[in-house]
């Protein structure tokens, strides 16, 4: 695939007022979400739930793409249409999560490195034929006593860059996601320092491995107080710190940045994104790639009556997409 096509896909992913829905939970993660609302974790229930999300009427008004899990990209709607085809036909770009999860980094207590590079080229080739046009790889950076280490940051940046280079070789736009985890009692200043170091390392690694930034999307965590921090930063502080950190680390040529919600409440994640747009003078589009913050309320309602609440649950998904789409333009009113 040409650089032009990669760039075109990347730009479509961050089209004005649109974001990406993350529905790439692994089977074990969706099991936790389902058990929380009393749904049995069967393959058919997972398929039906993903169909509920993806067939929401007019979803593409505010959603440009969706990140799928391996199982989902192989599944079909109840009418027998492969999900990836259904999405493409309805103006939503199919994406695929390709990492194999974060594992303990040997010799570095409390730190993780993401696995999944072995055999990745062949997997990406298959995903492209299944209809995927972008991929996602998540690195996990924990904040704690004396961590993260430079070694951990570098190991994850290197893996993200290897993955990104392989994606572009196979015609997929790489979404690179170095998530600085909210857990902990650290303050917003500490989060800023760690996020800045992580992004500097990442973009250095992408440059070294000849990754074309015009065909790459960053999925970033916001600069925010740790969940256990006594002093929680205000919406304005989070927006200002996040934008300042991104401006100091992310090249302006990148087509766009989407944020993960990372354990924020539905309203917090929307308010923070909206506030960033009040600052003006942004070098790149800032949008959203939320999972839980898009799905939680709808899943709860659907679980109570899978048939009777179907349309209502889809209405909630549409409303959440609309709220975040407006926030991605700075027009959300709260």
From Swiss-Prot:
InterPro entries named among the record's database cross-references: Aldolase_I_AS, Aldolase_TIM, FBA_I
* EC class (word): lyase
Spell out the reaction equation it catalyses: beta-D-fructose 1,6-bisphosphate = D-glyceraldehyde 3-phosphate + dihydroxyacetone phosphate
Under which EC number(s) is this enzyme classified? 4.1.2.13
User: Pathway it acts in?
Assistant: Carbohydrate degradation; glycolysis; D-glyceraldehyde 3-phosphate and glycerone phosphate from D-glucose: step 4/4
GO MF annotation terms: fructose-bisphosphate aldolase activity
- The record lists its disulfide bonds as none
**Which family does the entry's similarity section mention?**
Belongs to the class I fructose-bisphosphate aldolase family.
Q: What is this protein called?
A: Probable fructose-bisphosphate aldolase class 1
Taxonomic lineage is:
Bacteria, Pseudomonadati, Pseudomonadota, Gammaproteobacteria, Lysobacterales
